[in-house]
Design a protein with these regions (language model features):
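Alpha/beta enzyme core
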Residues: 1-215
Length: 215
């Protein structure tokens, strides 16, 4: 009963027809919805005509961060907040069923969530949304360097340390294996299979005869 949404990089497609074919391929594979991320709005309109469920994205877009003044929240000024609102309404009018709202002020999203009919999915935009989202990398703590963890994220485990410990154990294991091989501790009898002695004697005699030219 898992609802699966899959993202497509529209930059890898040079036409609406190309991206439509990719959408249909994913739907045939069992995907329930297509995540449009930072698609061109004309692409989104075109795909919506095929009644494919679409999930939009507004607010901070990492690949467009230079357009919004760098890696920082979007929507803190009236002008930016209005743009976020207009983008959401446009996606709603196109027919999107949900929208990611990334890194906008929590109180701005709270007001927008009261108005839009779409499900709002908060990514660092406060608790007044229908759904909360965090990347697994942030939840699991893949980055030991706290400067790489976004302000809005919370680390529930330190997988970076776990992976470092695993790597240390890998190195220890390979070194121990190397030492055992060098000092003939591996393989031992329990790691090997021996032939029946009678069969072994027959084999040794046979190859001796062969080597002596008595085939």
């Amino acid at each position: 009963n898992t609802f699966l949404t899959c993202g497509i990089k529209y930059t890898q497609h040079d036409s609406k027809e190309s991206i439509a074919r990719k959408c249909f391929e994913l739907i045939e594979l069992g995907v329930d919805s297509i995540h449009t991320n930072s698609w061109n709005v004309n692409f989104i309109k075109y795909i919506s005509e095929f009644n494919i469920p679409l999930q939009g994205h507004v607010g901070f877009v990492p690949m467009k961060s230079t357009w919004t003044g760098g890696v920082k929240p979007v929507g803190k000024t009236l002008k930016e907040a209005i743009k976020v609102y207009e983008d959401i309404i446009e996606l709603e009018n196109i027919g999107c069923w949900a929208v990611d709202v990334e890194c906008i002020p929590a109180d701005i999203l709270a007001e927008i969530s009261k108005i839009t009919k779409m499900l709002t999915i908060s990514i660092g935009s406060g608790s007044k949304s229908d759904v909360q989202f965090l990347f697994a990398e942030d939840i699991l703590g893949y980055h030991n360097d706290s400067s790489k963890t976004p302000r809005h994220a919370k680390k529930y485990r330190n997988f970076d340390k776990i992976y470092q410990d695993i790597q240390k154990e890998r190195i220890k294991a390979f070194k121990k294996y190397q030492t055992d091989v060098e000092f003939k501790k591996f393989p031992s009898k329990k790691h090997s299979v021996l032939a029946d002695q009678k069969e072994l004697m027959k084999f040794k005699k046979l190859i001796t005869d062969w080597n002596n030219g008595n085939k």
